[in-house]
């Protein structure tokens, strides 16, 4: 990192002083945090936005996973406001019913994205990190994409009650599956392929 680079850290609790790091005590889901970040960033744009935040876990897995992915979505909102074009975004997520929806949203903002499981993360843990590279910096962003109630609305609420079926859910496939033998040959919709063995 070049000398003189600005590093900002945000947490709900005070962070012990780190040389050359400015820390803020805020909740990234609030307007107050966004205002404080804007004040600190002035007109600059970030090279990297990294979120390792996590909710208090231990109640129910569905609730924990929802809250973790909600934090990731809020971190993505911060990235869209402060990341430079071509920048990098890294966030912790939990594999859950919201995972594919979250990945779709991230894909809309980055040329490349991938899920990574660091060696330091326990293999039985559901946590992974998503890395988005080459931020597209779109001129217009539909704010609903960054709202958990819209991005995750077709999945489950945090108590686990079914609110609707996601297109990624197995029951959706069974529910909407057509019961027929296939498409007519003249439609060019055959799913078979002939190959020499």
What are these regions (language model features)?
Residues 12-13, 28, 53-54, 88, ...:
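Short, ordered loop/turn segments at secondary-structure junctions
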Residues 20-23, 36-38, 61-65, 94, ...:
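Short coil/turn segments at secondary-structure boundaries
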Residues 17, 27-31, 40, 44, ...:
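Intrinsic disorder
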Residues 61, 65-115:
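Conserved Class I SAM-dependent methyltransferase catalytic core
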Residues 3-5, 26-27, 65, 69, ...:
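Aromatic/acidic cage segments in peptide-binding pockets
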Residues 102, 111-126, 133:
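Histidine/cysteine- and/or acidic
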Residues 3-57:
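S-adenosyl-L-methionine
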Residues 123-197:
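SAM/dcSAM-binding transferase cores
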């Amino acid at each position: 990192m070049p000398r003189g680079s600005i590093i900002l850290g945000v947490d709900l609790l005070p962070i012990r002083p780190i040389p050359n790091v400015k820390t803020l005590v805020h909740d990234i889901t609030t307007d107050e945090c966004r205002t404080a970040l804007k004040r600190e960033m002035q007109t600059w744009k970030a090279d990297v936005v990294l979120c390792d935040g996590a909710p208090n876990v231990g109640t129910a897995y569905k609730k924990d996973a929802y809250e973790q992915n909600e934090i990731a979505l809020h971190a993505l909102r911060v990235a869209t406001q402060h990341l430079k074009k071509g920048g990098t975004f890294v966030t912790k997520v939990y594999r859950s019913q919201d995972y594919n929806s979250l990945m779709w949203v991230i894909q809309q903002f980055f040329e490349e994205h991938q899920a990574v499981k660091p060696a330091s993360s326990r293999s039985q843990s559901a946590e992974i990190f998503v890395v988005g590279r080459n931020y597209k910096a779109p001129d217009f962003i539909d704010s609903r994409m960054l709202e958990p109630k819209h991005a995750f609305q077709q999945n489950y609420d945090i108590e686990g009650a079914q609110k609707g079926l996601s297109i990624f859910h197995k029951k959706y496939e069974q529910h909407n599956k057509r019961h027929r033998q296939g498409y007519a040959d003249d439609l060019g919709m055959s799913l078979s392929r002939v190959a020499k063995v």
